Curated annotation (Swiss-Prot):
GO molecular function terms attached to this record: retinal binding; retinol binding; serine-type peptidase activity
Record-given protein name: Retinol-binding protein 3
Chain's role: IRBP shuttles 11-cis and all trans retinoids between the retinol isomerase in the pigment epithelium and the visual pigments in the photoreceptor cells of the retina.
Propeptide: 18-22
Gene3D superfamilies: 2-enoyl-CoA Hydratase, Chain A, domain 1, 3.30.750.44
Basic residues: bias regions: 1233-1252
Region (4 X approximate tandem repeats): 23-1231
Gene: RBP3
Classification lineage: Eukaryota, Metazoa, Chordata, Craniata, Vertebrata
């Protein structure tokens, strides 16, 4: 930019130093200052100041004496430098003063404002109830605020009820930015306020956002009505912005010419006191709809429909007429699909698509056709279903017109026999080609009734001359088709002569809703040609309708080979429905009403029939004769392939079945579609792989001579020491990674004799670097395999010399013997051993011998396999020639079997223990090495945490000791998640406690660690709604209270809202005569609030001991006592109480139930509870992502040592959980609800010598026997909130 100014400003300066001496250098600065102060792209002016100073100092002189010429030169320079054609410098010596400004609106009367506005405003109602509004100047906010009521009453109300609106801006060259919201708001759908533009004003250096008005006086234009904006090449400024905004909002269709591409505010400013003026855009749009995208300024608004401005209104009315018809078009289209479309199962999806289709962008018939066809064919996947534009002569007269049958009647057959013979001769061309090949050509299809009449003549003149031919070529290249009624009859002549009726195809006709099966006819004039002789159909792009049907069905049935061009794809059995009729034509739907379904269940959806051999039509006959010659050897090739499989394939158990299937497919004509060795090889490969499930079976065509398979391999060549050193460096990569982790990569498997020959050098140059590492990574990701004879030697290095290990077994098809492969007793160099970790990296590229090594190491659990599933190669592959042809079969000749299971290795290859992309396999292996190094420490830490914190100290110490002895079980752990799963299983087996858990929680999930992350405490205001939602209360029949809550809260948390609990929960049930507490869905929680909850169900007086809790971490026993003071009124001990339980009842809910049952205060009805535990604690294990959840406390209140942990609370009345509430209500209704105070409670109060342990009476009132171990002294209570702690 600096360089541009440096070139431009010398021109300015030099031009101002002409002989007239009227121009001073200061004028350059003034002109530049006008730009700096007013140009709306100030960022484009960076560097101008320095360029000006440099230009002023320049002594170059450009002698332009004419100021008009100078103005033109300066304009071209400025526009070129700033790339803005709106910048214009003009010389106007006659303009002595600035043009007078229009009087301010505030100084005009209302009548003057209205008169001025009416000059540029016209409105009328056009034909078809289309509103027309022409605006030649956009008034500003001051005018609109004064005249809005007038405009609404006299203009808008006449237009708002029209069915569509045309807004004519063709003559609008400007206006006020402040008027934009008024225009947009009345056309903007909805009641929301929208940001439609942002305007930057350079003189004030301010940015103003333009929003639609929050309230519009009068009614807005309905969103479902179309709006069209007319534009011309003169439309400029604010009018362009309005057109662009409405187009971007998809609220209007712009019709006409591209607009001028002006500016929102273009001003002509005098340069200093000179006669030069600079026209400059002082404000700009920063992006319609606030998106900041490229706007219309400088380029103009591109119309949706381009047309000359003078024709824009006419074109707009045509667009509106089309859009008014759209709902009817869619409705007629949906009706036609429901009534006629043959693929009924696809109709609902089509109807749904049409109902949801967005047609807002449709402005022409071509647009509509394109959009409808794209949608219909994408959803239906049926190319036959399409909408077309039709001209008047093509337009359908109605839904009755269809292409299903020709309108003309069946022609009458002449009675004269000579004429009939001549007619047959004219239609059919018959000859016998060399090689006894029949040739039959006919160029049209007749109706079945015509063929029936002419049958004897056709038999004698056409069919009998072809009966004794060896093959038949049927020429349909010039056949445009005709009625399809004769197709089943023609097909019948190609069935086997002695066969019963054959199902040829079926058809479904939507009009009759009938599926019809078509069978071959057995009673024919003459003998069928049969299926054993070759039939070849010649086709071209002119082959159509019934001729296409015949070609398709002959190919589908496997009775013919097609040669030639793809057929026309012109089908019968369609129906034409008129969707729209206009004077220029209209739209019509072509809908298929009948579907062909072949014997494979495939529907033919039209389109051309693709030949088996595609050639030009004029070459089809020659090509068919070539294919015929190839097919003479087809049987021998297929059967020869089967014989090779029987002799050499390594899986004899499937060979017999594969041979039978090949012969069956050959007899069925399945290989008639093969037209050369290449296509036959492809088809045989696909069939063999599908039959066997073995992707290693290949048949291929090789025109060149292949090396004989039996040729003995050359003896291994032992390289020189120099060559060997170079080869080892190139083929082997070794490295010792941090942590004494060895890394070995080699990308090929050498033959055993070669390995033995260079063994000492390999040991010295490769193996010695790795043998003393702590663990080893063997990288086979890039190893395609090759020789497998060296695999046992490689495996032997990773096992001890004795005892020898059985690696795998090999079944050899040639000898039918199974050979066991074992480790070698002696190897060169030191063994790696069997105790150090081994990791094998594999990928999709790893094959044959590399897979054998990975399979063996995985099968014997000697290595961890990491990477991608391997290729699934073979130990040995044989390639055999099929007869003397250029066809070859490649197949595995040996099969490897697992040493541990005796089963053959999976044909799909090696499935890794850890499946990851090959690119991260090495880093995954290193992570596992690091993890396994941590395992001893992790087990030690876990044992110590259990010993120090488990609720049963003796069992915790025992578990820690036994856990250390299980370290070998963790030798093959591959992830922290697997380690957590294994550790949890061991701990639960050792303890018998399912609540002792291990979790793997990654760093990004730390917020879900139980007991580690504190729960956020909501505000008391939020708590009120939370309480209403969490607690369910009711008063049942007989004044029986009902209370359900599904989780216990923390004591400290509930203390803050005790008054809310009393107000919204407790007061609703405290005055009932009996209470049902529903714990069936309560999953527990903190136990700190149990003392307070229990206290409400005992009378005020000396505290009662509820339970004793042993806490292992601090090795202490705490006592739970009732509280002496509570928030709200007590329920007391005299009223009946029932607790409902289920197998879901857990944790704190079990503790509460256990206490109330043991003290005889409540009757428990339902199911045995889950047998949970006191709230456990979670501990982090070292620097891993493992967390141990350990039950650290247990109830020890019972004298006999029993508790509910692990076994659950047994109900007094056992019933299914869903029946518990009903049973409780029944028992409460048949029992007196008041009872005298139980003597047991008197005996359990503070200060009594005898204390009682009671049992629940029939309804949970205290009835007791003496139990001296329960009552002890309690500390004096203090006032607590509801559900507060002691």
């Amino acid at each position: 930019m600096v360089r541009k100014w440096a070139l431009l400003l010398p021109m300015l300066l030099c031009g101002l130093t002409g002989p007239a001496h009227l121009f001073q250098p200061s004028l350059v600065l003034e002109m530049a200052q006008v730009l700096l102060d007013n140009y709306c792209f100030p960022e484009n002016l960076m560097g101008m100041q320095g360029a000006i100073e440099q230009a002023i100092k320049s002594q170059e002189i450009l002698s332009i004496s004419d100021p008009q010429t100078l103005a033109h030169v300066l304009t071209a320079g400025v526009q070129s430098s700033l790339n803005d054609p709106r910048l214009v410098i003009s010389y106007e010596p006659s303009t002595l003063e600035a043009p007078p400004r229009a009087p301010a609106v505030t100084n005009l009367t209302l009548e003057e404002i209205i008169a001025g506005l009416q000059d540029g405003l016209r409105h009328e109602i056009l034909e078809g109830n289309v509103g027309y509004l022409r605006v030649d100047d956009i008034p500003g906010q001051e005018v609109m605020s004064k005249l809005r009521s007038f405009l609404v009453a006299n203009v808008w109300r006449k237009l708002v009820n029209t069915s569509a609106l045309v807004l004519d801006l063709r003559h609008c060259t400007g206006g006020h930015v402040s008027g934009i919201p008024y225009v947009i708001s009345y056309l903007h759908p909805g009641s929301t306020v929208s940001h439609v533009d942002t305007v930057y004003d350079r003189p004030s250096n301010t940015t103003t956002e333009i929003w639609t008005l929050p309230e519009a006086l009068g009614e807005k234009y309905s969103a479902d009505k179309d709006v069209v904006v007319l534009t011309s090449s003169r439309t400029g400024g604010v009018a362009e912005d309005i057109a662009y905004i409405l187009k971007q909002m998809r609220r209007a269709i712009v019709v006409g010419e591209r607009t001028v591409g002006g500016a929102l505010n273009l001003q002509k400013l005098r340069v200093g006191q000179s006669d030069f003026f600079l026209t400059v855009p002082v404000s700009r749009s920063l992006g319609p709809l606030g998106e900041g995208s490229q706007t219309w300024e400088g380029s103009g608004v591109l119309p949706c429909v381009g047309t000359p401005a003078e024709q824009a209104l006419e074109k707009a009315l045509a667009v509106l007429m089309l859009r008014r018809a759209l709902p009817g078009v869619i409705q007629r289209l949906q009706e036609a699909l429901r009534e006629y479309y043959t693929l009924v199962d696809r109709v609902p999806a089509l109807l749904s698509h049409l109902a949801a289709m967005d047609l807002s962008s449709v402005v022409s018939e071509d647009d509509l056709v394109t959009k409808l066809n794209a949608g219909l064919q994408a959803v239906s996947e049926d190319p036959r279903l399409q909408v077309q534009v039709v001209r008047p002569k093509e337009a359908s007269s109605g839904p009755e017109e269809e292409a299903e049958e020709p309108p003309e009647a069946v022609p009458e057959v002449p009675e004269d026999e000579a004429v009939r013979r001549a007619l047959v001769d004219s239609v059919f061309q018959v000859s016998v080609l060399p090689g006894n090949v029949g040739y039959l050509r006919f160029d049209s299809f007749a109706d079945a009734s015509v063929l029936e009449v002419l049958g004897p003549y056709i038999l004698h003149q056409v069919w009998e001359p072809l009966q004794d031919t060896e093959h038949l070529i049927m020429d349909l290249r010039q056949n445009p088709g005709g009625p399809s009624s004769a197709v089943p009859l023609l097909l019948s002549y190609f069935q086997s002569p002695d066969a019963s009726p054959v199902r040829l195809f079926s058809t479904y006709d939507r009009r009759t809703n009938i599926t019809r099966e078509h069978f071959s006819q057995t009673e024919l004039l003459g003998r069928p040609y049969g299926t054993q002789r070759g039939v070849y159909l010649l086709t071209s792009h002119r082959t159509a309708t019934a001729a296409e049907e015949l070609a398709f069905l002959m190919q589908s049935l496997g009775w013919a080979t097609l040669v030639g061009e793809i057929t026309a794809g012109s089908l019968l059995h369609t129906h034409t429905v008129s969707l729209l009729e206009t004077p220029e034509g209209g739209l019509a739907l072509t809908v298929p009403v009948l579907t062909f379904i072949d014997n494979h269940g495939e529907c033919w959806l039209g389109g051309g029939v693709v030949p088996d051999a595609i050639v030009l039509a004029e070459e089809a006959l020659d090509r068919a004769q070539e294919v015929l010659e190839f097919h003479r050897s087809l049987g021998e090739l297929v059967e020869g392939t089967g014989r090779l499989l029987e002799a050499h394939y390594a899986r004899p158990e499937v060979v017999g079945q594969m041979g039978a299937l090949l012969r069956a497919k050959l007899a069925q004509g399945a290989y008639r579609t093969a037209v050369d060795l290449e296509s036959l090889a492809s088809q045989l490969t696909a069939d063999l792989q599908e039959m066997s499930g073995d992707h290693r079976l290949l048949v291929f065509h090789s025109p060149g001579e292949m090396v004989a398979e039996e040729a003995p391999p050359p003896p291994p060549v032992v390289p020189s020491p120099e060559e060997l050193s170079y080869l080892i460096e190139a083929l082997f990569k070794t490295e010792v990674l941090p942590g004494q982790l060895g890394y070995l990569r080699f990308d090929a498997m050498a033959e055993l004799e070669t390995v033995k020959a260079v063994g000492p050098q390999l040991v010295q140059l490769v193996w010695q670097k790795l043998v003393d590492t702590a663990a080893l990574v063997v990288d086979l990701r890039y190893n395609p395999g090759s020789y497998s004879t060296a695999v046992p030697l490689l495996c032997s290095y990773f096992f001890e010399a004795e005892p020898r290990r059985h690696l795998y077994s090999v079944f050899d098809r040639a000898t039918s013997r199974v050979t066991e492969v074992w480790t070698l007793p002696h190897v060169t160099g030191q063994r790696y051993g069997s105790h150090k970790d081994l990791y094998v990296l594999v990928s999709h590229t790893s094959g044959s011998a590399a897979e054998a090594f990975a399979h063996t190491m995985q099968d014997l659990q000697r290595a961890t396999i990491i990477g991608e599933p391997t290729a699934g190669g073979a130990l040995s592959v044989g390639i055999y020639q099929v007869g003397s042809s250029a066809l070859y079969a490649s197949m595995p000749t040996q099969m490897a079997m697992s040493a541990s299971t005796g089963e053959a290795w999976d044909l799909a290859g090696v499935e890794p223990d850890i499946t990851v992309p090959m690119s991260v396999a090495l880093s995954t292996a290193r992570d596992i090495v690091t993890l396994r190094a941590k395992v001893p420490t992790v087990l030690q830490t876990a044992g110590k945490l259990v010993a120090d914190n488990y609720a049963s100290p003796e069992l915790g110490v025992k578990m820690a000791a036994e856990l250390s002895g299980l370290q070998s079980r963790y030798a093959r752990v591959t992830s922290e998640a697997a380690l957590a799963e294994l550790l949890q299983a061991d701990l639960q087996v050792l303890s018998g406690d399912p609540h002792l858990k291990t979790a793997h929680i990654p760093e990004d999930a730390k917020d879900r660690i139980p007991g580690i992350v504190p729960m956020q405490i909501p505000s008391p205001e939020v708590f009120e709604d939370l309480i209403k939602f969490s607690f369910h209360t009711n008063v049942l029949e007989g004044n029986v209270g009902y209370l359900r809550f599904d989780m216990f809260g923390d004591c400290e948390l509930l203390t803050q809202v005790s008054e809310l609990l009393v107000e919204h929960v407790w007061k609703k049930i405290v005055h009932t005569d009996a209470l049902i507490v529903d714990m069936r869905f309560n999953i527990g929680g903190p136990t700190s609030s149990i003392s307070a909850l229990c206290s409400y169900f005992f009378d005020e007086g000396p505290p009662i001991l509820l339970d004793k809790i042993y806490n292992r971490p601090n090795n202490s026993v705490s006592e739970l006592w009732t509280l002496s003071q509570l928030e709200g009124e007590r329920y007391g001990s005299k009223k009946s109480m029932v607790i409902l339980t289920s197998t879901l009842t857990a944790g704190a809910a079990e503790e509460f139930t256990y206490i109330m049952k043991r003290l005889g205060r409540a009757l428990v009805i339902g199911e045995v509870t889950s047998g949970g535990c006191q709230p456990p604690q979670t501990y982090h294990v070292d620097d891993t992502d493992l967390y141990l959840t350990i039950p650290t406390a247990r109830s020890v209140g019972a004298a006999d040592g029993s508790s509910w942990e692990g076994v659950g609370v047994v109900p007094d009345v056992a019933v299914p959980a869903e029946a518990a509430l009903t049973r409780a209500q029944e028992m409460l209704q048949h029992t007196p609800l008041r009872a005298r105070r139980s003597p047991r409670l008197h005996g359990r109060r503070k200060g009594h010598h005898r204390q009682s342990q009671g049992r629940a009476g029939s309804l949970g009132r205290n009835q007791g026997v003496v139990r001296p171990e329960v009552l002890t002294e309690a500390p004096s209570g203090q006032k607590r909130g509801l559900l507060q702690c002691g």
